[in-house]
């Protein structure tokens, strides 16, 4: 019984520990989502948790939105073949 409980807890942690994280990126131009209030940031948290992003938490780090718990399908900075502000 205890073994089953431990195995179940491990499976739950695998999804949390191995989830993707990174800077949220605009697909149109390859730029990061800007922010100015470092640390806990409602704008970044809302953007990261949006249905099209699927993240679990977001905050402002180095003046850009950093997201945790993203699905593998969500692109993060840098995007291949798109460099922000460069042609």
From Swiss-Prot:
UniProt-listed Gene3D superfamilies: Knottin, scorpion toxin-like
One annotated GO biological process: defense response
Molecular function via GO: sodium channel inhibitor activity; toxin activity
Disulfide bridge map: 31-84, 35-60, 44-65, 48-67
Chain ranges of the LCN-type CS-alpha/beta domain: 20-85
Modified residues (Cysteine amide): 84
Signal peptide: 1-19
Official protein name in the record: Toxin CsEv1
Alphabetical list of InterPro entries matching this protein: LCN-type_CS_alpha_beta_dom, Scorpion_toxin-like, Scorpion_toxin-like_sf, Scorpion_toxinL, Scorpion_toxinL/defensin
Family note: Belongs to the long (4 C-C) scorpion toxin superfamily. Sodium channel inhibitor family. Beta subfamily.
Keywords, in A-Z order: Amidation, Disulfide bond, Ion channel impairing toxin, Neurotoxin, Secreted, Signal, Toxin, Voltage-gated sodium channel impairing toxin
Reported tissue expression: Expressed by the venom gland.
Function: Beta toxins bind voltage-independently at site-4 of sodium channels (Nav) and shift the voltage of activation toward more negative potentials thereby affecting sodium channel activation and promoting spontaneous and repetitive firing. Induces immediate paralysis in crickets after injection, with a total paralysis occurring within 15-30 minutes and lasting for 1-2 hours. Is also lethal to vertebrate (chicks) when injected in very high dosages (more than 100 mg/kg).
Domain characteristics, as noted in the entry: Has the structural arrangement of an alpha-helix connected to antiparallel beta-sheets by disulfide bonds (CS-alpha/beta).
TM spans (from-to): none
Gene Ontology CC annotation, any one: extracellular region
Subcellular location, principal: secreted
């Amino acid at each position: 019984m205890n073994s089953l409980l431990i195995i179940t807890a491990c499976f739950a942690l695998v999804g949390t520990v191995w989830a993707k994280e990174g800077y949220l990126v605009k697909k149109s131009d390859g730029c990061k989502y800007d922010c100015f209030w470092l640390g806990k940031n409602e704008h970044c948290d809302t953007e990261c948790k949006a249905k099209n992003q699927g993240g679990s938490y977001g905050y402002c780090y180095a003046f850009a939105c950093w997201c945790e718990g993203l699905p593998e399908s969500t692109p993060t900075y840098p995007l291949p073949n798109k460099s922000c502000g460069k042609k």
